[in-house]
């Protein structure tokens, strides 16, 4: 947070066009990946608690189907839904709204994810944000940076994925392992995605 807040408040400086916007994108995207990685790593721990009557095989099927639903929505929405919306209202607004939907999905999982069907439905809602995350940020970054240094900026942009994964592995993992209610993973994800949506709303549309 100490690094993110200054980035979100930074203004463009003469001689460095797009640099402040790029830093805001990295900060906003980092929040997204804290929430996503928390789900990826700890969903099965939650299923063991929420669906204790299932065998290991059936629980594995529920987990696999949950991720199938998430990725199916993530694969289909960008071309058929998100891009047409982005052409009308802009990529940044579309992305922020998608993350807001993802936040709602995580809140739903935290409150109501007590059966396989409910989990599938809510994972589909979460998939709206996932669809945006795998498609829109790269297009947004490409608009904001010097095209001659695109490779450098994309490499730096990948840090907004890698560093949150380390945060989850080293910090969130310890917290979740000690939490009596594994549903806390969805609370963490909801807060992270809400912060991401708010942060993206502070990014200027080009």
What are these regions (language model features)?
Residues 77-91:
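Helix-to-loop junctions at the C-terminal end of transmembrane segments
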Residues 7, 167, 187-206:
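Multi-pass alpha-helical transporter architecture, strongest
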Residues 52-72:
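Loop-to-transmembrane helix entry
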Residues 132-146:
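Intracellular juxtamembrane helix-capping segments at the cytosolic ends
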Residues 21-42, 124:
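Pair of pore-lining "gating" transmembrane helices in MFS-fold secondary transporters
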Residues 174-194:
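A membrane-interface helix-boundary motif in multi-pass transporters
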Residues 60, 145-157:
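Loop-to-transmembrane helix entry/capping segments in MFS-fold secondary transporters
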Residues 100-114:
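C-terminal ends and interior cores of transmembrane alpha-helices
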